[in-house]
Amino acid sequence: MARIAGVDLPNKKRMEYALTYIYGIGLHNSRLILNAVGIDFNKRAFELTEDEAAAIRKEIQENYMVEGDLRKKVAMDIKSLMDLGSYRGLRHRKGLPCRGQKTKTNARTRKGKKKTVGAATK
């Protein structure tokens, strides 16, 4: 099992899909990485030699922000929006959608479980 950027890649998957298990690398970036290193997309993860795995590690480390660093950057970006007091920051602080969706009936994922209001018993 190849371990790249702190993630164990699934052995049976083709490399172009196996690399997408790393946070911050999608299908497009995985194909760019494999092209840069010169590895066939159809090669399975268990078929990787140690040299090929090292080349992929080097390519990712030099050119991509992945896993913990990327998560930290996203969290810091959201925190800076909240500190600025921008509209998006306020929406993040309140736990509501930031991108203009309606919230009267939907947005249950962001708002959480329904809270019934005004239905008190006598």
Swiss-Prot record:
Region (Disordered): 95-122
Signal sequence, start to end: none
Entry keyword Phosphoprotein: no
Keyword Isomerase: no
GO molecular function, one term: structural constituent of ribosome
GO terms classed as biological process: translation
InterPro entries: Rbsml_uS13_C (IPR027437), Ribosomal_uS13 (IPR001892), Ribosomal_uS13-like_H2TH (IPR010979), Ribosomal_uS13_bac-type (IPR019980), Ribosomal_uS13_CS (IPR018269)
A single cellular component GO annotation: cytosol
UniProt-listed SUPFAM superfamilies: S13-like H2TH domain (SSF46946)
Protein origin, superkingdom: Bacteria
Ranges annotated as biased composition (Basic residues): 95-116
Classification via Pfam families: Ribosomal_S13
Keywords: Ribonucleoprotein, Ribosomal protein, RNA-binding, rRNA-binding, tRNA-binding
HAMAP family: Ribosomal_uS13
PANTHER family reported for this sequence: 30S RIBOSOMAL PROTEIN S13/40S RIBOSOMAL PROTEIN S18, SMALL RIBOSOMAL SUBUNIT PROTEIN US13M
Subunit-level organization: Part of the 30S ribosomal subunit. Forms a loose heterodimer with protein S19. Forms two bridges to the 50S subunit in the 70S ribosome.
Protein task: Located at the top of the head of the 30S subunit, it contacts several helices of the 16S rRNA. In the 70S ribosome it contacts the 23S rRNA (bridge B1a) and protein L5 of the 50S subunit (bridge B1b), connecting the 2 subunits; these bridges are implicated in subunit movement. Contacts the tRNAs in the A and P-sites.
Similarity section: Belongs to the universal ribosomal protein uS13 family.
Protein name: Small ribosomal subunit protein uS13
Origin species: Aliarcobacter butzleri (strain RM4018) (Arcobacter butzleri)
Gene responsible for this protein: rpsM
